[in-house]
Structure formats: structure tokens, C-alpha cells
Amino acid sequence: EFTFGEMQMIVRSVATPGHTPGSTSLEVDGKYLMTGDAVFVTGIGRPDLGGETEPWARDLFHTIHDRLAPLDHDLLVCPAHYTSRTEASEDGALHRQLGDLLENDPIVSMGDEEEFVKYVVDHLGTPPDQYGDIRKVNLGIIEPDDEMLKELEVGRNECALTA
């Protein structure tokens, strides 16, 4: 539980491995699910960027079905990135109800693990060009300047796999 001035919020961590082994989502006040790159408004985070595509795809399948599916389906999934502004709601917000994502997203709703893994492996394409730089920044190996940060963060989301 956190207090900011007069505002209090309850934050609960949910391990959501798949995009990366340490991926963690945050449930905030029982209303929002900050998913980082685990799942997006449409699609999932790529499980291949660490070179362990099939095992991480299996982790992601179990994240969806064993960790996210039991949560309140009214939670609003708020990912770290978006692929297109068309994913925004009428008020411009980039979120989607968890239940809608689980039931209607063509990838997230796949109920068979082998089908899911095969689909993911067969549809990934090449990793994003900037991934090497992103990894070096995340590990503290390089210190990005403002221009590099803008390029890495503002560019289109290439860490997602959508149907």
C-alpha cells in the first residue's frame, strides 16, 4: 500500500513471465493492470528477444491462462506500448478490459498450448533493429542521450506480436 499526499493506492505484483522471465505486472487499486510488455491492448510481448523463443512462449501461455485469467476480468489492461493510435478508446486512453482481451484477442484467447507456441514461433519475424541498444540501456552498459531515448521509446512497438 502506498500513500502519495492524501491519496492512497494498493499495488499488487503479478509475475507475468513470457516476454522476459522477470516480467512483472502491477494491479493497481483493483482497477488497473499495468502489464508492461507482457500483453498489449492487441497481442502479446515477443518471447524471442532473449533467444529462448519456445520456452518463453510456453511461459507466456501459462501467464495468460494461469495468472491473468483468474484475475478480475473488469481490470483495465494498461500496457507500456501501443502499436497504433487506433487501439485507443474514444477518450484517447490506451487500455482494454482484461476479460475482453482474454476472450476476443486472436492470440491471447488461444486455449491450446501447442497451438499457441506454434503460432508464436511461426509468426515472429525478425527482432527489432533497436533491440540491442534497448538491452544495453536497460543493463546500464550505455547511457542514452535525449535523441536516442526518443528514438527508442517513440518508435512503433516492435516488441509485440499481433494477429
Which ranges hold each PLM region?
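Accessory terminal helices/loops
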Residues: 62-163
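Catalytic core of the metallo-beta-lactamase
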Residues: 1-79, 85, 162-163
